[in-house]
């Protein structure tokens, strides 16, 4: 069973400014888990930031807020991003890189390459949840 070193929560708005708040939360996470390597920090941060950017970009017209939980455990990092939006089109399909000429569609593929992604949707008020899990290097 994993030992939780630090668990942080933030209620964020659906604006790009919330990405700054997210990075401030990352700084607090790393302060509470200084043993996490730079590589693990970078991979986890990339995955979470890509999902958060998608939530903001695609949810802008439908909802104003989202919730972020960050957790550092002795053997993994974990993030939960929840928003009240509807099922995200394409979220349940395989996340692969688009063709080089594509103008978008790389966010989920980058996140999946950096860490393990889980997506769930329910009809409760929480709506959709993205979970990012990153196993720490031994």
Please identify what each model-predicted range represents.
Residues 76-105:
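Glycine-rich/acidic phosphate-handling loop/turn and adjacent ATP-lid/helix
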Residues 3-38:
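Helix-loop-beta hinge of the Bergerat
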Residues 27-49, 100-102:
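Conserved short strand/loop->alpha-helix "switch" segment adjacent to the catalytic nucleotide/phosphoryl-transfer site
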Residues 55-59:
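Short helix-loop "hinge" at the ATP-lid/N-box region of the Bergerat-fold HATPase_c
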Residues 73-76, 124-126:
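Short strand-connecting beta-turns/loops that link adjacent beta-strands
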Residues 1-17, 112-138:
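Flexible, glycine-/charge-rich segments associated with ATP-binding catalytic modules
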Residues 65-75:
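Short beta-strand/loop element within the Bergerat-fold HATPase_c
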Residues 101-115:
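Glycine-rich phosphate-binding loop
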């Amino acid at each position: 069973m994993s030992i939780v070193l630090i668990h942080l929560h933030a209620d964020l708005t659906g604006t790009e400014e919330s990405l700054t708040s997210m990075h401030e939360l990352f700084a607090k996470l790393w302060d509470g888990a200084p043993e996490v390597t730079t590589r693990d920090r970078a991979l986890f941060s990339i995955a979470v930031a890509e999902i958060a950017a998608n939530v903001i970009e695609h949810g802008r017209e439908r909802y104003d807020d989202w919730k972020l939980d960050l957790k550092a455990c002795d053997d993994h990092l974990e993030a939960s991003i929840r928003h009240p939006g509807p099922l995200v089109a394409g979220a349940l399909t395989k996340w692969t890189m688009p063709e080089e000429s594509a103008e978008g569609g790389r966010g989920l593929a980058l996140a999946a390459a950096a860490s393990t992604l889980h997506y769930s949707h329910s009809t409760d008020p929480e709506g959709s949840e993205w979970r990012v899990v990153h196993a720490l290097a031994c």
